[in-house]
């Protein structure tokens, strides 16, 4: 079975393809010229993964898997959260890291608890399957 991965991140695609080696399914990429991806307007990682997976599955008429993930910092009330990838105006890893460190200035080491949250959602023909994990 082929499952289209609802991302244009080639690194992420390679990771999923590696995980599926030797299995009875394979992950395939979306065409790079797909420009109509919907905005991630959800208020949770799960909602954003659903938006992407549903759109891609219905567009290509095949099973799709989407993920949404990010960093949640307790001292910042869960920020950057769903905005992790676009936390800074530059929307780059370096820019996001710099903004996070600026916002953490003055926060004591013992109050710097955080977690990385990843939500995976599969969608096909109106049915969903969902999994979520965190790394503290």
Place the predicted regions along the sequence by residue.
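Anionic-ligand binding patches
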Residues: 2-4, 11-136
């Amino acid at each position: 079975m082929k499952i289209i991965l609802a991302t244009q991140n080639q690194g992420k695609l390679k990771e999923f393809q590696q995980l599926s080696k030797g299995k009875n399914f394979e992950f395939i990429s979306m065409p790079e010229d797909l420009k109509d991806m919907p905005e991630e307007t959800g208020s949770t990682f799960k909602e954003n993964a659903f938006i992407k997976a549903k759109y891609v599955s219905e567009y290509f008429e095949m099973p799709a898997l989407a993920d949404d993930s990010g960093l949640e910092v307790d001292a910042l009330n869960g920020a950057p959260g769903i905005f992790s990838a676009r936390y800074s105006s530059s929307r780059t890893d370096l820019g996001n890291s710099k903004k996070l460190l600026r916002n953490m200035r003055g926060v004591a080491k013992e109050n710097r608890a955080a977690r990385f949250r990843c939500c995976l959602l599969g969608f096909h023909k109106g049915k969903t399957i969902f999994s979520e994990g965190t790394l503290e």
